[in-house]
């Protein structure tokens, strides 16, 4: 019921905005709803575009970007409550579940950027900088965030420093996103995209909890969807010097708030891929060394019934192909989000040709592809 209420509020807000702007001559409202990870980036990009690039007096636009979660974004675009559905996950499962609507509305998934998931932690002083995530303890991390089993910090201590924590157990508290991967693109990326393959099967109860099928256990403290609210909950609940815990956040948020993270005594959890320890950064992500990466998607309808389709295409053409590259890059850098490579862009073209001269093969719906991948990856 709570999820429906939130979605209903977002719908009313979008409709109210449309009603208000309908009285303004020559202004078309483009409404975007969904992922709280996509929202700040798209809001800044669209604001710059509206103020500096939208010069056609006959087709002036206002782009309203609201958060609410990836699930809300998908439902909004499928049901026609928004022009753009923002989703920080691959929407393939939703597309298959709603294939008729997806086809009828000619929905296209646009990957506008990529972000990484990273874990920060609070540890006792003697263990700061001594934790490591590997394929051998990734399931322990998932059990921790499910909140049913007590998971002590020694599960994540590097083997060569384990003797430092033998005298005392330090149980961890986890701070997952409310609703699990069903509601949150951040939670889905946390569960599915680590690229660490454990030799052991993940506990079925843990998986169902993290998917949002059943509620978190009593040892977890679920947070709101946005990074800032989740982080503030983490800070508030770990004020006691004897309490320790972990939370997953967007890498973009971590990089932009690194000083606050350090000031609170928190550390970033490195990952061991094969034989190399890697800390998350734009550089390690772009070099494919840090692999816990997710897409940031905007889904649009290419249906002839979409009265704003021309303005929507013009905006995204500006973003992908025609805009000032330095300006756009600076906006991405501000949020710690990576732009797509040319090879990644090609995946959104039906003919694998990302030339701006080939846009008729870019603006085709997801199911027009012989093997739909729904965005760039």
UniProtKB/Swiss-Prot annotation:
InterPro entries in the record: PBP_domain, Phosphate_ABC_transporter
Major subcellular site: membrane
Signal peptide: 1-23
Localization in the cell: Cell membrane
Keywords for the protein's UniProt record, in alphabetical order: Cell membrane, Lipoprotein, Membrane, Palmitate, Signal
UniProt name for this protein: Uncharacterized lipoprotein MG412
Residues with a covalently attached lipid (N-palmitoyl cysteine): 24
SUPFAM superfamilies assigned to the protein according to its UniProt record, in alphabetical order: Periplasmic binding protein-like II (SSF53850)
Residues with lipidation of kind S-diacylglycerol cysteine: 24
Keyword DNA repair appears in the UniProt entry: no
GO CC, alphabetical: plasma membrane
Source organism, top-level taxon: Bacteria
Membrane topology term: Lipid-anchor
Natural source organism: Mycoplasma genitalium (strain ATCC 33530 / DSM 19775 / NCTC 10195 / G37)
């Amino acid at each position: 019921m709570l999820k429906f209420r939130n979605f209903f509020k977002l719908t009313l807000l979008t409709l109210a905005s449309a009603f208000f702007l309908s009285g303004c001559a020559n202004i078309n409202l483009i409404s975007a709803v969904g992922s709280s990870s996509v929202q700040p980036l798209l809001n800044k990009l669209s604001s710059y575009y509206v103020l500096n690039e939208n010069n056609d007096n006959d087709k002036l636009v206002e782009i309203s970007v609201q958060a609410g979660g990836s699930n809300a974004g998908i439902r909004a675009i499928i049901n026609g409550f928004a022009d753009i559905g923002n989703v920080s996950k691959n929407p393939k499962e939703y597309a298959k579940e709603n294939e008729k609507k997806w086809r009828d509305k000619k929905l296209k998934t646009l990957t506008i950027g990529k972000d990484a998931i990273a874990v920060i932690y609070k540890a006792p002083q003697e263990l700061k900088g001594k934790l490591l995530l590997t394929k051998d303890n990734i399931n322990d991390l998932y059990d921790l965030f499910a909140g049913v089993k007590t998971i002590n910090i020694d599960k994540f201590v590097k083997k060569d420093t384990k003797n430092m924590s033998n005298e005392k157990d330090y149980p961890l508290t986890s701070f997952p996103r409310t609703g699990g991967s069903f509601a949150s693109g951040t939670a889905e990326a946390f569960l599915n995209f680590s690229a660490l393959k454990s030799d052991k099967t993940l506990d079925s109860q843990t998986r169902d909890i993290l998917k949002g099928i059943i509620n978190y256990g009593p040892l977890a403290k679920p947070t709101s969807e946005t990074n800032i609210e989740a982080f503030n909950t983490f800070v508030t609940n770990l004020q006691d010097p004897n309490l320790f815990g972990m939370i997953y956040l967007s890498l973009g948020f971590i990089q932009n708030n690194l000083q606050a993270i350090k000031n609170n005594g928190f550390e970033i959890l490195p990952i061991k891929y094969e034989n190399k320890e890697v800390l998350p950064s734009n550089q390690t992500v772009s070099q494919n060394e840090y692999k816990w990466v997710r897409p940031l998607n905007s889904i649009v309808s290419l249906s002839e019934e979409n009265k704003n389709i021309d303005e929507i295409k013009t905006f995204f053409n500006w973003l992908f192909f025609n805009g000032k590259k330095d300006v756009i890059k600076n906006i991405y850098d501000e949020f710690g989000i990576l732009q797509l490579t040319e090879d990644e862009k090609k995946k959104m073209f039906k003919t694998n040709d990302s030339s701006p001269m080939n846009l008729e093969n870019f603006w085709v719906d997801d199911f027009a592809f012989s093997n739909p991948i729904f965005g760039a990856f």
